[in-house]
């Protein structure tokens, strides 16, 4: 109960306003990636297969994202990435699928009405997977807490969103192979952002 209370207090504090240094987050994310580049790149072969297909991305994207964040957290804590960590996110398969489906429906409805609401929801739910994976929240509570957290400085999170999108676009241009670097790097940067706003305990 104490952990749940603490995370709600952290979210409440974040919603009142926070500042992010995009340059610092890119550096922190890169430092995490460079400590285990081979492990991240190997997992990204599977990640690419999942995210390159809309259906598999919708159904498996949640657990894959959680696995990336889990690995980034282990590296930051000074631990080695082991084979079992690659699919750790699948331990919460059901809740993460539910989360992805909820996000998909809400963002799709937003895009159907106007593009702006869809983009708003997509950015607002950036941190949803963290609340499910690290804090055992249900999907509906996770998207609520993510939106509330991002509301503390939507502009900077959106800017980070754009920069990571540009980085991955460059990865695609590099014969597609570059994505094996830019995709895990992006997950490490998003992890760094969330950890900066809502500190993840051991």
Regions found by a protein language model. Name each.
Residues 3-13, 52-80, 104-144, 172-202:
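Selective recognition of hydrophobic, aromatic-rich stretches within alpha-helical transmembrane segments
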Residues 17, 36, 63, 78, ...:
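Residue-level signal for short amphipathic helical patches enriched in basic/charged
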Residues 20-49, 83-109, 123-172, 202:
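Interfacial aromatic "cap" segments that immediately flank transmembrane helices
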